[in-house]
Amino acid sequence: MKKEIVEVVAAVVFDRGKLLCSQRPEGKAHAGKWEFPGGKLEKGETAALALMRELAEELNYRVNPLDEMYRLAVHPTPERELILHFVRAYPESGSFPEPCENQQFCWVTPTELDQVDFLSTDQEFVDFLKMAYGVK
């Protein structure tokens, strides 16, 4: 049996000293939890293109991807593996997040990351960010 690989991209948008986070809306798995906005890669799509598409669809937000900061394999099983790509991006001039799927968003400083109820799958990356920014 062939193992299913599901790839997901998450945006790391750092603007004016704060990181963009979005809350999962009601009706979706893990509703109310916070995450870095993004979504699944479509067949043949790069992480950068998926990031641009997902942020446009979910937040009406135009960004320019830079580079992959972190990659994480989550919950590997014999049947399925989830790969998270955390991609740094910066907003296009004049673009601001406007949620399209009834979710909330917020901007947090690296020192505020522990105050946000993140999805468990994002926690390793949150710890990496805290270390990178010297947050204890």
Mark where each language-model region is.
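Generic C-terminal helix-cap and adjacent flexible tail
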Residues: 1-3, 130-136
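Conserved N-terminal beta-strand and adjoining loop/helix that marks the start
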Residues: 1-19, 40
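Short secondary-structure boundary/capping segments
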Residues: 3, 11, 26, 76-79, ...
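Conserved hydrophobic "DFG−1" position in protein kinase catalytic cores
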Residues: 13-14, 21, 89-91, 107
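Conserved Nudix-box catalytic region and its N-terminal flanking loop in Nudix hydrolases
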Residues: 18-57
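Active-site-adjacent beta-strand/loop module that shapes the phosphate/pyrophosphate-binding cleft
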Residues: 62-64, 72-95, 106
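NUDIX/MutT-family hydrolases
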Residues: 86-88, 97-129
